[in-house]
Amino acid sequence: MVQFLGKQGTAGELIHMVTLDKTGKKSFGICIVRGEVKDSPNTKTTGIFIKGIVPDSPAHLCGRLKVGDRILSLNGKDVRNSTEQAVIDLIKEADFKIELEIQTFDKSDEQQAKSDPRSNGYMQAKNKFNQEQTTNNNASGGQGMGQGQGQGQGMAGMNRQQSMQKRNTTFTASMRQKHSNYADEDDEDTRDMTGRIRTEAGYEIDRASAGNCKLNKQEKDRDKEQEDEFGYTMAKINKRYNMMKDLRRIEVQRDASKPLGLALAGHKDRQKMACFVAGVDPNGALGSVDIKPGDEIVEVNGNVLKNRCHLNASAVFKNVDGDKLVMITSRRKPNDEGMCVKPIKKFPTASDETKFIFDQFPKARTVQVRKEGFLGIMVIYGKHAEVGSGIFISDLREGSNAELAGVKVGDMLLAVNQDVTLESNYDDATGLLKRAEGVVTMILLTLKSEEAIKAEKAAEEKKKEEAKKEEEKPQEPATAEIKPNKKILIELKVEKKPMGVIVCGGKNNHVTTGCVITHVYPEGQVAADKRLKIFDHICDINGTPIHVGSMTTLKVHQLFHTTYEKAVTLTVFRADPPELEKFNVDLMKKAGKELGLSLSPNEIGCTIADLIQGQYPEIDSKLQRGDIITKFNGDALEGLPFQVCYALFKGANGKVSMEVTRPKPTLRTEAPKA
């Protein structure tokens, strides 16, 4: 609804009232900014201006608002000198209706602004939404009466215009915030949309993807759909591309041996970029899904294609990893002629040039290998007595996908995907393998006899058994290497010197299932030996089992603080991954007071070397000697110099939050017999 007051300002500035009703809509559809308009070289007008209008919104449908209009009052409150945030708050408080007093400029000023290179603030915002400015000649009813009342003023304004030089109304409003803020939109997403991020499933997507779209609380409550691996739900897709019609999510499983059968085209207008479906091959991978010529592809697997060239989109399709393809499309109207070419109806008939290979070589087999940066094979050009010249597998990378798929050294390479390599030279064959992406289909021929293959397998198994026996041979304790998840006996030379470790464990300790090293002092004998690490589980010392369930913490500590004559033997178990627990502890620290902890630095944080008697941590008893503080007030301590850690502890006041790491070993020693 639009009502005109019938007032007209100087130089053709029209002042009118506009009432907007957003019933059934998400927002009023106006974007505001505080700025200024230069009336002349010496005067300027400041205030709140309309920076953008959302298509199909109440502000757009009323037809009487345009980019660059100045808001004088809102619901009767003067906003000429108000801040941008204050006006936003007023609009949010206004419920479903707002009354705006608008000051707009006549068309002559607008035309002059178009030719003025300094008017970028006005024109960029205008072009962003492709607004078509409507004239005031269509006013009816109350509008006509308003024009009659203001006729004298309008004539006076025209006379003044003829006698004065044309006014330069350059709109120089600048945004105060980094992102556009729609005045009545709650929980607006103002994050940086450049670059890429990873989804919860571990897939990399564009920040601007619908999978990264932010939903407010109400939208989250309504969205019952589970996110897929790219973060997609239809609610997020519809919000990200709310200006597009008939949005669809299309999923298809790709077959490496079958082409997609998709032809792409660009926009008819060379000033615009888009990726349209020009044609779909009925025999291709997309022939059975809901996609047809004229559809605009806006995303694929989290890669945004909207406003991108179709040639770039083609490269994106080729580089997409995985067997699953998820596309977001917008179905255009049948008479929409945005696509630059006519729909393609005929595709060349696909011929499988590899079929004859199986007729010529009945024992040939197909192997599919996922290429993750490399295939893991090396090839040579050689000659075989039975099949002649060709490309052969000369080497395999151990543990590669090719080895796991069954590729063997000596196999003859007959084809890569749809390309036959029977008559290829070395350069052609390696070029095919380098260009292949995703899942690579190879046709191979094993030329060795079954007896030779069995003999090779037997030799490999024998080699593995010998290696296993070699591992099982007892090692010399003085030089024994500590291997993960195995009990290893080592001998440590101490020569009456301190071992230099802090351990956790004891029946009156928080760790009751084993004795674990939590700190190694750099000047001790353990550090000099260089084999033991923090979180190593010590099962016995000098043949005496350390069963902490029957030993006090003091007794366990004494075992490691005793001065041994020459050497000490330890049975060590190194768990991989380490057996740990993490928890948070909150303490209160008064200004000028200490925390009551004696700390020693290590590579993952600070180990508690001692608790000062009478201080809060010792009384609270949540912490103990040997605990490792890995975070302090949210700051990770891993890798920080001890001076920095000390400064963090020293400078803290009030409530202090710490993340503590404590060993939690599996019970590996038996209780002593009574």
Curated annotation (Swiss-Prot):
| Signal peptide from the UniProt entry | none
Domain PDZ intervals: 17-106, 249-332, 364-448, 489-577, 584-664
Q: Which intervals of the chain are annotated as region Disordered? A: 133-192, 458-481
- Cell compartments where the protein resides: Cell projection, Rhabdomere
Explain the post-translational modification: Phosphorylated by inaC.
Single GO term (MF): calmodulin binding
Swapping K333Q leads to an effect described as: Slight reduction in interaction with inaC
What tissue specificity is annotated for this entry?
Expressed in photoreceptor cells (R cells) of the compound eyes and ocelli.
* Stretches with biased composition (Polar residues): 159-175
Question: Could you say what the effect of mutating H310L is?
Answer: 100% increased interaction with inaC
Can you tell which superkingdom this protein's organism belongs to? Eukaryota
Outcome following mutation: H310R: 50% reduced interaction with inaC
> What happens after mutating M442K?
In allele inaD-P215; slow recovery of light-induced responses and altered light sensitivity. Abolishes interaction with trp
For the modification Phosphoserine, which residues carry it? S598, S600
- Gene3D superfamilies in alphabetical order: 2.30.42.10
Q: Where is the composition biased (Basic and acidic residues)?
A: 458-475
Q: Where is the composition biased (Gly residues)?
A: 141-155
GO biological processes: cellular response to light stimulus; detection of light stimulus involved in sensory perception; negative regulation of opsin-mediated signaling pathway; phototransduction; protein localization; sensory perception of sound; visual perception
Q: Which SUPFAM superfamilies match?
A: PDZ domain-like (SSF50156)
Keywords for this protein: Calmodulin-binding, Cell projection, Phosphoprotein, Repeat, Sensory transduction, Vision
Q: Which GO terms describe its cellular component?
A: inaD signaling complex; rhabdomere
* UniProt remark on domains: Second PDZ domain is a type I PDZ domain that tethers type I PDZ ligand inaC by interaction with its C-terminus.
Q: How is this protein organized at the quaternary level?
A: Interacts with the C-terminus of trp, and with norpA and inaC to form the inaD signaling complex. Interacts with Fkbp59, which together with trpl, rhodopsin and calmodulin may also be part of the inaD complex.
Task: Describe its function.
Answer: Involved in the negative feedback regulation of the light-activated signaling cascade in photoreceptors through a calcium-mediated process. Interacts with tetrapeptide ligand located in C-terminal sequence of 3 key components of the visual cascade, tethering them and forming a macromolecular signaling phototransduction complex.
Mind telling me what this protein is named? Inactivation-no-after-potential D protein
Origin species, per record, is Drosophila melanogaster
Gene encoding this chain? inaD
